Curated annotation (Swiss-Prot):
Gene that encodes the chain: hst-1
Organism listed in the record: Caenorhabditis elegans
Side of membrane Cytoplasmic, spans: 1-13
Protein's membrane topology: Single-pass type II membrane protein
PANTHER family listed in its UniProt record: BIFUNCTIONAL HEPARAN SULFATE N-DEACETYLASE_N-SULFOTRANSFERASE, HEPARAN SULFATE SULFOTRANSFERASE
Name of the featured protein: Bifunctional heparan sulfate N-deacetylase/N-sulfotransferase 1
Amino acid sequence: MIITPYLNRKITRPLKWILALIFLYLIYICLFSNNSKPPKPRKKPKLVENYTCPFARTEGTASENLFFHTNNGTDARILVILDSLFSRHGKTIIQILNSQKLQFKAEAVSKNLPVLTTSRRGRYSLIIIENYYKYLNMAQWNRQLLDKYCKEYRVPMFSFMSSKPNDQLKRIKIKGSSLWMWQNQRIQRLAVTPSIIHRISKIGNYRQFSSSDPADWILFETSEKFESVLSGTVKSGYERAVVVRDKGLEDGVERIIFGRNLTDFQVKITFLDALWWAMGNQKSFTLDRFVQVDIDDVFVGAQGTRIVEEDVRKLISTQKEFRNYVQNFTFMLGFSGSYFRNGDDLEDRGDEFLVENAEKFVWFPHMWRHNHAHEHNFTYLEAIMAQNKLFAQNMHLPVDYPYAIAPQHDGVFPVHEQLFRAWRKVWNVSVTATEEYPHFKPATARKGFIHAGIHVLPRQTCGLYTHTQLFDEYPEGFDKVQKSIEGGDLFFTILLNPISIFMTHQQNYAYDRLALYTFENLFRFIKCWTNIKLKWQDPLTSSQLYFQKFPDERTPLWTNPCTDPRHHAILPPSINCTKKSLPDLLIIGPQKTGSTALASFLSLHPNTSQNTPVPGSFEEVQFFGGQNYLKGVEWYMSNFPSSSTVTFEKSATYFDNPSAPKQAASLVPHAKIVIILQNPAQRAYSWFQHILAHEDPVAITAGSLEVILDSNSTSSKKVRQRCISGGRYVHHLTKWLEHFSLQQMIFVDSDELKMKPPTVLNSLSKWLDLPEFPFETYIRYSPSKGFHCRLLDGKTKCLGESKGRKYPEMPENLRRKLDKIFSLDNSALYKFLRKNRLKIPTWLEESVRIRA
């Protein structure tokens, strides 16, 4: 049966009319309504006069064969003696040394000089003293020692002098020298004078000073013994040295003395030149500087702030002009395809015109919708990258190089592993860049690293951000940018970095086009004042060059992401900063000294917790300096699930690993360090027995440690090194003390640990500020094992069979041979402990007494 509902014609007729009217309205909207976005009225870009070089000659004046200073057997390291570790000028010196990747040791001036030599060579190739007055008034013994070192090892000295405002004396003879100085001087001209020091500076260049500039310069009188490097001319017309080179003809010590601090850009360039004269060589020094300018988010921006067609035309023409300053210069354009044609009519046309001229630029991908990597997993990241790649293919964008940039550098550092995986899979990325490694500030300390096959280069800012579009609205005035260009931070960014990758945004190329002004004037100023050769090369070539120059940076240096607010903001959810997940204490060995027993006993304390056992590495984490380090911070944190008062790990491989101190200090700088001191002869013998039990083929073939010590074969030398290395205490301690203070360390006597473990544990727990705990109740000697074990629930729990292994006593002739090998090391350890008023183990007392 069919049921037909009752229809009232009075109801259906009006409904039909309403539907018809709606249909007609929709047709009208489609045909006649103007659906375009009205463009925001654009003013013409403000014209600002470009920098003009005051010299007709702009070609370089550097010598083809530069002279470099040579030392007599010294390490490539600098000793910096500062007025204070917190002085502003001292920090500037340190930042320059960091930027040049130079190894240095910085100390505040004190009564005692640091040790200047090892048993075989000098520790430093250059001495920098921030305050020359402090050097002149140094205790006679210290100054004689310093001068003797500089003379014997041909080590130059740099130092700075400043005027004393209230001193009435103008002309003063420098103490112990024939050099005369003038203080509180006002100069009219500062000029670069001929000298073997200059590399970057253009000889003959000068700049004028006004009569209102302060009279606070120090000038030096020159002679055959003292050469001017940078000169200042006073009102009377006399030309004297602002920077003087003492040739060492009086006392055998070469010095470069600066009469001005590094706030003046010409003085700063001279300091940089002097550094390369003292520390460089023909192979390491170059005047080439590679510059890459990235335009990030070329389609991203609020309506009314984006580039239009005229801006694109100007971008193309300016790129050609820039090639007069920078060889092969090409802009790099980063894209998030979802935002294409997302502006008003003029801006949409700008996007279209940019794509029409895509072949004129180099393109690289961001994310499809400017996504933040740390918020997404691998599957999602892969999908949005694939969308962006499809967009690039459809628009015929030439993505010619395996280079990508993550929006806001999110996921690069701290590393988001899933971003790296997705990059490799979708784009086959092998190069990226970030401003966040190891930290955003200071910029001079930024570095590169390689992770998961991707080369990460340091990235630089230029003072331009998405909101900086107009000269008149620049925060703090556009004078700030001009100062940065003309001898300021931006200028020195290029001078200090062999490769500079600058981050800009498309908004910086709209309206007043601040980016074009900034870089044109930067290039002009560099060409005017320096011999630097500016070049562009693709990012893949740059990455290869960077890590060829700085191979030590290949392995990343992990930091605690929870202590840097910028890093904390871009952490993946898997890292929880509210939970303590890094150790407070490291038991670093060395191996075969009882470190496993110490860790086992310390874990008895209810307020301590040890890392979870790690398979394949004798339950040790073996993170710092080992293969596990490449697994990253998140993996390391995952080994410390507890949040006890004191969390610790024991990895006996750390002590003599050359990379461990620096890596540990970077991640856990406030950790306390436990070092166990055992007679190195006994330790070497124990280690040999250990590898013999583990069937090391070289040890088995040799049969005894004595044979290993006498053999000259390569394989035997490696085993010998493994046996001997851990017992060279002061040699390795020196490296740990470069990164940790002595107050962070405690030394445990291995013999005392073996005989009286509760005493050692009580002392250790007190040092760690732990509540008292009756260790003697939970530690018992096991006659069958021959060592102490833990007592839990009335039962002894001893270490495994590999611990406390019984083996024949060491032959007396072998002991004598090992004692001789370690005699100098033992003597150094004795002096170190005595100097620092630390307890000296009985075995060490006897060793030194027998040797005496």
